[in-house]
C-alpha cells in the first residue's frame, strides 16, 4: 500500500478546524504528541496516513496507525491522543462522517449475496482494521477533488458512496451495515444513546430506556454494554462531564451553576468526578480553558 500521495494531499489541504470544501470530509494534521483529551467520537470512518492514535472507550483501548482505519458507528464519549506525531513527521488523518440514510440507501441497492454475512450480536461501537488498497484508492481520488473545485459538487458524492461501499463489503461490514438498518441492535442502542445525549441532566431508570429502545431490560443492558463498553449510568456521567467542560470554557466563574446545569445535585461530587475524568479540578480547568471553547469535531480523526 502506497500512502505517499495520501499523505501529500492531507498535508496540503489540512486546516486548523479540520474542515474541507467537501461536505462530511475532515482532515487532521497534528505536529506533536498530545495528552489524552475527552470528546465525542462522532459517527465516522477515520483513516490514518501517518502517525498513530489511541482511543479509549470505557475499558477498551483502540490503537490505529498509518494504513489502518477506525469506524465509530455510534456517537460515543471517548478519550484520545496522538502517540506518534512531530513537527518533522506530523500525524495525518482522513475522516468521513457516516450518515445512516446514505448507508440504508446502499443496502437497498445491494443485490442478494453482495454483502458478507454478519453475526447477530450487536457489534462494538468502535472497530479498527487494516485499510484495503481499494479503500485507500477511493480516499485519494476523493481528496484529489479538492484540487479541482469545479468537480466537487458532481463527483464527490459518487466517490463518497464508493468509500461507503468498500466499508460495507469490508472487514467491518457489521458495524457499518447496522448504521443503516432501522431494526438492528445497534439502532436500538443508538436510540437510547441519543436520548441520554439530549436529556443528560435528567435522571432515568434503565427499564425506561429499555422500553424506549424496544428491548427487554436484560437484552438492552447487554447490547448497550457491547456497543458502548459502559453501562447507561456511566455513559450519562461521561456526557455530563463533557458538557460541563464545554460550559466551563464560557462560564469559568460559575462552577456550582454548571454542575447543577448538567444534572449534579452535589457540587462536591461534581468536582470529584470532574477531577477524576480530566485530571484537574473544574475551577483550575476552567481558568485554563477560558476563551478556548473546546470543539465538537469528531475525536477519532
Predicted regions and their residues:
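Amphipathic alpha-helical segments enriched in hydrophobic/aromatic residues interleaved with Lys/Arg
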Residues: 2, 102-167, 174, 192-194
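A ubiquitous short alpha-helical element
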Residues: 65, 122-130, 180, 208
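Basic/polar phosphate-binding segments, predominantly the helix-turn-helix DNA-binding elements
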Residues: 162, 166-172, 179-181, 185, ...
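Short alpha-helical segment immediately N-terminal to, or the first helix within
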Residues: 195-199, 246-250
